[in-house]
Amino acid sequence: MLLKSLFLLFLTAIAFASELQIGILTSVPDDKCKVKSKPGDLISVHYEGKLEDGTVFDSSYSRGQPISFQLGIGQVIQGWDQGLTRMCIGEKRKLTIPSHLAYGDRGVGPIPAKATLVFVAELVDIAGSSKHDEL
């Protein structure tokens, strides 16, 4: 029975590790969030990216300028397209992105193949909208 329980726990851990994990670090109250990011929006994001061991591989904060891109059309890794959807301006999230939603088997620059990536990302702006627009 113990062996069966351990096996089920192992399978659960594998399944959980293969999915995008989203943690809310800074939330925005509903009455202050009148618009949320959606696919097709041009958004600006400040972020810091780390490997699982804590090694920082990229940071818009260190450059002093957020990155802007169109959400949901493949301009960035899938983990970002999925994890930055339905965010309020000013919201900050921690995204733990498995390799198949990042750079997969190929890796890029300082990011090794099959790496799980951890980002802290803050939505700075949604182009063409104001904080007072309706959803």
Curated annotation (Swiss-Prot):
Q: Which reaction does it catalyse?
A: [protein]-peptidylproline (omega=180) = [protein]-peptidylproline (omega=0)
Q: Name one GO cellular component term.
A: endoplasmic reticulum
* Major location (coarse): endoplasmic reticulum
The chain's disulfide connectivity reads none
Q: Where in the cell is it found?
A: Endoplasmic reticulum
Q: What does the record list as GO biological process?
A: chaperone-mediated protein folding
Give the UniProt keywords, A-Z.
Endoplasmic reticulum, Isomerase, Rotamase, Signal
- UniProt domain PPIase FKBP-type: residue ranges: 40-127
One function term, GO molecular function aspect: peptidyl-prolyl cis-trans isomerase activity
PANTHER family from the UniProt entry? PEPTIDYLPROLYL ISOMERASE
Task: State what protein this is by name.
Answer: FK506-binding protein 2
